[in-house]
């Protein structure tokens, strides 16, 4: 149903997506195991991700989207052809990822739809130690008398990011069933391997053919994320001196002990993930490998500003060099790898991308919550390979855990926001 609603000074169409419909779709998708594998070098990292890609491909074709395809890497591409008389409307992409995180099992997910959440503590049936409560998850208050979905206690739920997948699919169905709603070309993209940092590794941007995009991979209803960390990796390689341990006095220099000394020299009460928040950056050791002769320490380095990122590298290198200098004969190599950059640097050059998203969220009846991500998204990478791409909410909560949950009305509002956003691009072109 289309209802014309006036909010001066403009008229726009109110959109309604059924929370029950999007919930049914979401619950089907989460039962497909699509966990990605951080140890794999294949694309996709796990073949089972393609199981959901194939389902989405079939369902898109079933909606009448005839160009829907799935490629060898598990990416799903589709186009809802524009129906406006305007010729200058940019093609807009809506993207979500099919994989779930390696942090928690995604096998045999059993979703439970709590249709009218009453505020009571929820004990998950398959592991009664898993308890969901308003005191631990205050956002539950926003869903009193509405539906929420949990897993059964043994697995994650998969709302990250099958809620985004469900919202995009429900919006696609809306467009196909309501041809009077005007829009330009809408590009749909479902990616594998976002959770292991490879979501854009094999995407064909020419095939996608979108000028601007939006990932559906966010939290509370109304949230809009247009800023991420800038990210790098650092590897410190320490070379010692190895001799027979029986004759090693005053000769052997153990690289493993030096690596331990470097880690011990790092600040204890600052500069780490466990001691920082908001807009603070950090340095985080993630792996130590080696033998007495040679050892490596791998770090991730994060800051919202590229200049801040470099300052972290300079400080880390100085600390390590001072430690290594205390071991006669030892040497050190410090290498940097760029991972991704703050998407805000690109989005600020295209302010309409975020402005239109804010307007769409408001048209969906929500308050915009502008947020920064203390991490990265596929949108970070898309923004730097030609498709400026902020991140829009879906409602996911307690992600990557057995207590993951989502509100059905949030997913419905995400789908409505997609429709409004597509209409705004048509109106403003």
Segments and roles (model prediction):
Residues 1-13:
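Short, Lys/Arg-enriched N-terminal segments with co-localized hydrophobic residues
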């Amino acid at each position: 149903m289309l209802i014309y609603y006036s909010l001066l000074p403009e008229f726009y169409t109110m959109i309604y997506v059924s929370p029950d419909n999007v919930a049914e779709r979401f619950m089907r998708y989460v039962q497909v195991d699509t966990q990605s594998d951080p140890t794999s070098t294949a694309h996709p990292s796990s073949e089972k991700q393609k199981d959901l890609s194939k389902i989405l491909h079939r369902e898109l074709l079933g909606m009448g989207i005839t160009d829907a395809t799935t490629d060898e890497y598990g990416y799903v591409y589709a186009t809802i052809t524009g129906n406006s008389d305007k010729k200058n409307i940019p093609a807009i992409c809506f993207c979500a990822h099919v994989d779930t995180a390696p942090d928690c099992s995604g096998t045999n997910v059993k979703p439970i739809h709590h249709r009218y959440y009453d505020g009571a503590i929820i004990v998950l049936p398959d592991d009664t130690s898993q308890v969901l409560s308003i005191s631990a998850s205050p956002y539950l208050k926003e869903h009193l008398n509405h539906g929420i979905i949990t897993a059964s206690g043994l697995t994650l739920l998969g709302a990250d990011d099958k809620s985004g997948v469900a919202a995009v699919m429900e919006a696609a169905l809306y467009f196909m069933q309501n041809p009077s709603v005007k829009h330009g070309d809408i590009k749909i993209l479902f990616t594998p391997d976002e959770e292991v940092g490879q979501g854009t590794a094999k995407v064909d941007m020419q095939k996608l053919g979108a000028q601007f995009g939006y990932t559906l991979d966010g939290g509370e209803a109304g949230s809009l994320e247009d800023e991420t960390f800038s990210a790098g990796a650092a590897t410190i390689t320490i070379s010692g001196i190895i001799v027979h341990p029986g004759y090693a006095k005053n000769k052997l220099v153990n690289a493993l002990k030096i690596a331990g000394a470097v880690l011990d020299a790092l600040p204890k009460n600052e500069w780490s993930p466990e001691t920082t928040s908001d807009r603070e950056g950090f340095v985080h050791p993630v792996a130590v490998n080696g033998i007495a002769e040679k050892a490596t320490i791998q770090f991730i380095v994060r800051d919202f500003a590229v200049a801040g990122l470099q300052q972290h590298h300079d400080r880390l290198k100085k600390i390590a060099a001072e430690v290594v200098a205390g071991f006669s004969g030892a040497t050190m190599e410090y290498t940097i790898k760029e991972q991704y950059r703050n998407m805000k640097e690109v989005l600020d050059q295209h302010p309409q991308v975020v402005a239109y998203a804010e307007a769409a969220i408001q048209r969906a009846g929500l308050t915009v919550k502008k947020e920064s991500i203390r991490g990265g998204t596929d949108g970070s990478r898309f923004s730097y390979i030609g498709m400026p791409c902020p991140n829009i909410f879906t409602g996911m909560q307690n992600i990557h855990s057995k207590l993951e949950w989502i509100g059905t009305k949030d997913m419905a509002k995400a789908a409505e926001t997609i429709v409004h956003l597509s209409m705004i691009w048509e109106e403003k072109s």
